[in-house]
Design a protein with these regions (language model features):
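Active-site-adjacent segment of SDR/Rossmann-fold oxidoreductases
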Residues: 124, 140, 161-172
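C-terminal helical subdomain
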Residues: 175-176, 191-231
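Active-site helix of classical SDR
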Residues: 117, 151
């Protein structure tokens, strides 16, 4: 699909990956709207993207997440897609995580990333896309990351079911199942410390794959055998 007709909303644009994606889309001529939690970071990303429309949101307020989609469609004169880059992590054995942290992870990694596409489905038309980042933990959940992995698996399952529902609609549902990316994300865990991790994928390579997948109308980005990332249509 062409990705520059009307515009794309990037929730989570104040994170390293979301900011890089929004900037890349802007550089390719896409009209972007950016949304995030940190207002100062959001203002910087907006300026870098040619003073793109920007809106702060609280991922715990699911109605606000949904309203952000309507806001973006109004600001951009329509909406072709939403790419959700929101996320949080925690480390530690399941018995040490606690229900408060578990609720946080499921809200930030599943419920909020579902709220944006859910609201976007009636807005984007044929040729549009809804997309969200999950992770390789969906396929192989590691010890010490049970709740994080479960929250990402919930989002992955939801995306796959919605993809089936959207068959014939012309709307693409893209799951971005990334490996470890060098964003510093693991160092911002809400609980615990990350284990020793191998060198992650450069942010630019992850962004390249996401943009290529959006352009191709793909359904999945995942680690590849002969390349860091594969794109499946």
């Amino acid at each position: 699909m062409p990705i520059s007709r009307r515009g794309i909303l990037v929730p989570g644009a104040t994170g390293t990956l979301g900011a890089a994606l929004a900037l890349r889309l802007h550089e390719q001529g896409v009209a972007v709207a950016v949304a995030g939690r940190d207002r100062a970071s959001l203002a910087r990303v907006s300026r870098a993207c040619g003073n793109a429309p920007a809106r702060a949101f609280d991922a715990y307020d699911l109605d606000q997440c949904a309203r952000t989609v309507t806001w973006a469609a109004d600001e951009l004169g329509g909406l072709d897609g939403v790419v959700v880059c929101v996320g949080s992590t925690a480390f530690g054995p399941a018995e040490s995580v606690g229900d408060v942290v578990a609720e946080h992870l499921f809200t930030i990694n599943a419920l909020a990333p579902m709220a944006f596409p859910r609201a976007a489905l009636p807005v984007v038309g044929p040729g549009g896309v809804i997309a969200a980042i999950t992770g390789v933990v969906v396929d192989s959940p590691p010890a010490g990351m049970a709740d994080y992995s479960a929250s990402k698996a919930a989002l992955s399952t939801w995306l796959r079911a919605v993809r089936r529902e959207q068959r014939g609609s012309g709307v693409t549902v893209l799951e971005i199942r990334l490996p470890h990316v060098e964003t510093g994300f693991a160092g911002r865990a809400v609980l615990g410390s990350a284990p020793v991790l191998p060198t992650g994928l450069p942010v630019a390579e992850a962004v390249d794959a996401i943009v290529a997948a959006l352009s191709a109308g793909a359904r999945l980005v995942k680690p590849g055998r002969d390349a860091p990332l594969d794109i499946e249509r």
